[in-house]
Amino acid sequence: MNIQQIVKEKGLGLLFRQGTVGIEKESQRVHADGSIVTSEHPKAFGNRSYHPYIQTDFAESQLELITPPNKKIEDTLRWLSALHEVTLRTIDENEYIFPMSMPAGLPPEQEIRVAQLDNAADVAYREHLVASYGKAKQMVSGIHYNFQLDPKLVETLFNAQTDYKSAVDFQNNLYLKMAKNFLRYQWIPLYLLSATPTVEANYFKDGSPLKPNQYVRSLRSSKYGYVNAPDIIVSFDSIEKYVETLEHWVNSGRLIAEKEFYSNVRLRGAKKAREFLHTGIQYLEFRLFDLNPFEAYGINLKDAKFIHHFILLMIWLEETADQDAVELGRARLGEVAFEDPHSETAYRDEGEQIINQLIDMLKAIGAEQSAVEFAEEKLAQFANPGQTLCARLVDAIEQAGGYQQLGGEIAKRNKVQAFERFYALSAFDNMELSTQALMFDAIQKGLNMEILDENDQFLRLQFGDHFEYVKNGNMTSHDSYISPLIMENKVVTKKVLAKAGFNVPQSLEFTSVEQAVASYPLFEGKAVVIKPKSTNFGLGISIFQQGVHDKADFAKAVEIAFREDKEVMVEDYLVGTEYRFFVLGNETLAVLLRVPANVMGDGVHTVAELVAAKNDHPLRGDGSRTPLKKIALGEIEQLQLKEQGLTVDSVPAKDQLVQLRANSNISTGGDSIDMTDEMHPSYKDLAVGITKAMGAAVCGVDLIIPDLKKPAEPNLSSWGVIEANFNPMMMMHIFPYSGKSRRLTLNVLGMLFPELV
């Protein structure tokens, strides 16, 4: 069967280059100096018996981060980024993730703790590995690259050939060709991507085989790495021989289980190899790859795509390696692994020949030009070995003064980077912050998570057989359909709350600008709020705390409100302080004082300059990707300045508070101050009652309260309801400008999955 010919004749280039990729990355938790920790796996990650993303490999210190499979390599690496950020922000503040594959600072063997798992068989398996290989070899880490061809491609290729009658037989032989050819040419990606040139002497039982100042390309892939005894050979000639020889080694006791066979390619998709005979190989796991210490997550997008294309080349090639060729590949791997990283490889001609075939394949299947160019960069590294990853790593080790020193320095930099935007998941930065926070907590606690629609903030979460849908961080099936519709309409909200006996301010509604402006005499001199009938996040709201005295200002506020809706309300302004109550179920979980957008004068700078300086705060940004919003100087802000006799060019006196907004929404530049513990419980109970009247499970209730310490009384002079909000913002509670953080996303997960708590 000539796959090249079929792909070309049937125009299958796009389908051919597609596939599904998942990555497993092992790493050691270390101290700041790069030495391995002896602490337990953090309990904050939940139970390893079910965690889909954050596991331990051999030891308690050895993290294993597992991405879900994705059709886009970019998405797989985004997940890997998110898993690293969750992990680095969760482990002890004095712990780091070591960026290299070979361990450094190994503690005495008796202090290396085998992973403490619930399943006794899993622990027993690890104890067997200790007896067979010692603990040091088990501490080696790397990247496992899981790859599946597009099932439609496999089906199309099967239908286009005549050699195989059974689809299962065809699929097995297709994946076996991929596996055998990879094992034949595995030395090539090792030459280009290896990064384990050295290790400390205590890694070896009988002394280091390395001479002083000697570096090699890959200790991990050499006979000193994570490998079986040299006489354990499993045949890849056919799926039947593979099953037969693998079962032989297990039955003879040389391997305790099939998974102890440490081939650089592992057949995947069944619990036992014999099942492949009937169900077929589903995907392959490529276990060759060292961690790239120069990348925060151990691998970069270019290399991940290169690996993808190299794997595809293995079935594109006309040849199919037999077992002798597989063994030749294993021998060459051992030779190249022990070459000097700065030296030209003994097999340069073969390497250049294969990469040239890769370039031809990329052009034939219509790959991106960038993929061709990157393959050409790899080709050039055969003539310039100093450009390879391992050679560059050796240079960096020499410059840093040692392997462990370099690893510790990089580990510390990576952790600092993970905290630069500690409130976000940088790979999913286009999603709203509340959703990112929920995703962070879901990953940390071990919920399966699927992003159904990234732009619409739609997630599917699952624990066991129980699944829930979440939109925008806290919109769930626990809310009734009607509740957000009630809260969106401020007129309906007021009527529902009034009927339920809650204090609401009086108001009039208008359907045209002319009608509203004509009513100015009714409100002249009165303190009023002008706002759209249907609004959220403070859009279109103007507040005249000192009374409205200028018809032009009144008209401008009306015009601003009508930009947001076709109906507008003018309501009495309630005297007091506005607080936001976050209610979930039967409990008020957080209370926030939102201080309207403001600046403090210094007697030197203009209002515009003071605003610019305050906007430089690292938590301020667009308000959707940052916890705080930058303060604007638009029409509403300039109206507010005019009320105070100021303009943007005014220079306020020292310590003069300048209000830029009357409404206190964080989404319009306000400051957030946690007041949960200071608020009298009677108001918290009122907020719960208001939420129930709305028919909501999650609600943001805005109350005006003159004195938060006095118990609530049944009149407007004691308290009043301004708004009830669906999908209330959570980030201002999680990351307040001042006060205690309230991690509300954990409460949302607790509501959805009480069995997880």
From Swiss-Prot:
The keyword Ligase applies. Mg(2+) 1 binds at D702, E723. Mn(2+) 2 binds at E723, N725. It catalyses: L-cysteine + L-glutamate + ATP = gamma-L-glutamyl-L-cysteine + ADP + phosphate + H(+); gamma-L-glutamyl-L-cysteine + glycine + ATP = glutathione + ADP + phosphate + H(+). GO terms for cellular component: cytosol. Binds 2 magnesium or manganese ions per subunit. Mn(2+) 1 binds at D702, E723. Residues 494-757 form the ATP-grasp domain. GO terms for molecular function: ATP binding; glutamate-cysteine ligase activity; glutathione synthase activity; metal ion binding. NCBIfam families: glu_cys_lig_rel, PRK02471.1. Its cofactor is Mg(2+); Mn(2+). Monomer. Synthesizes glutathione from L-glutamate and L-cysteine via gamma-L-glutamyl-L-cysteine. This is Glutathione biosynthesis bifunctional protein GshAB. In the N-terminal section; belongs to the glutamate--cysteine ligase type 1 family. Type 2 subfamily. Its EC number is 6.3.2.2, 6.3.2.3. It comes from the Bacteria. Residues 1-337 are annotated as: Glutamate--cysteine ligase. Mg(2+) 2 binds at E723, N725. ATP binds at residues 521-580. Pathway: Sulfur metabolism; glutathione biosynthesis; glutathione from L-cysteine and L-glutamate: step 1/2; Sulfur metabolism; glutathione biosynthesis; glutathione from L-cysteine and L-glutamate: step 2/2. Keywords: ATP-binding, Glutathione biosynthesis, Ligase, Magnesium, Manganese, Metal-binding, Multifunctional enzyme, Nucleotide-binding.
